[in-house]
């Protein structure tokens, strides 16, 4: 029985939540393995919108288990809020449906304060952090001074660890010119309370998943952000603080590499990016504004307008390589309807030379100018179409050209926001 990893193949916001939601029908367990509540999944089911930032998108399916792995940085405030919201809508009737790793690191109040203060101090050099404490939490994890969920469940241990960490956090904030309220007793009291709320969901996730596999369960690993934001393989330093690529799926939940059978990359039919960093195919004209307006390109987490551009085949081919993609699900194909022509970036012009592969040096990428291939557009609306043969010939030609340029088959197409507005050409769980 195959286990499937879903990753963003661009700069995040590709529509992973919708595809994971769709594929959850064929899985028994959905696993989040990295990132935190800086990601936002917007799901529309029967016209009803749900936005989740931390809990896996599969939670909307009754009877499915959802797991938050050790690689996730965990904000218990957000978790409790999402649990309460789901329960108010009868979407989490059984607490055993949700499992959280005891070893996931916890986002503490000082992490958020440091994140915001650092970004403000950078001025024009801002990287576009969401200010939710993700980076500082990963930093503490690597420096071996972080707090984990298991620490919230022991009041004495929590008090000791807060007492150890808080002075250095206050000192850094003071250097940054920030003076947030960080009361030790209040933090210990609040996070003890949050620990009591989280305790019923906390478990040894590695062992839990191992037993699930032994019992023949199918796993769906849900990535956050996108390949181009990976801390090692993205446009460093304009990246997130975790590994977003498929190789991290098993590391972030305590399994071995043989647990993965299929890797599905999610890509929009065009491209978007939030925050700073190189983006060769960016459109800063009325075409870019048109894509933003039609596509509703505003962050689910921050509400910030996204930068928009044509599809970048070099970046997508790079994502296929570093993730080992078996297939691509292309989202928002419907947004391109009505454009007289559609373009694909097929090269970069840098210092008078044309490159046909994405350079590993982000400073070269910063100077790159996209070289485009132009294809005829289509006027037909796609939202009500449900099969490949129903698509306009020019839309099919566009998809086929992307396949040729990237070297990976397109196995799914999204033609609208609702779960039902999807054309699945190949089911990864049956590939």
UniProtKB/Swiss-Prot annotation:
IMP binds at residues 13-16, 38-41, 130, 144, 225, 240, 304. The keyword Metal-binding applies. Signal peptide: none annotated. Substrate binds at residues 300-306. PROSITE patterns: ADENYLOSUCCIN_SYN_1, ADENYLOSUCCIN_SYN_2. Keywords: Cytoplasm, GTP-binding, Ligase, Magnesium, Metal-binding, Nucleotide-binding, Purine biosynthesis. GO terms for molecular function: adenylosuccinate synthase activity; GTP binding; magnesium ion binding. GTP binds at residues 12-18, 40-42, 306, 332-334, 414-416. The keyword Phosphoprotein does not apply. SMART domains: Adenylsucc_synt. It catalyses: IMP + L-aspartate + GTP = N(6)-(1,2-dicarboxyethyl)-AMP + GDP + phosphate + 2 H(+). Coiled coil: none annotated. Belongs to the adenylosuccinate synthetase family. This is Adenylosuccinate synthetase. The lineage of its organism: Bacteria, Pseudomonadati, Myxococcota, Myxococcia, Myxococcales.
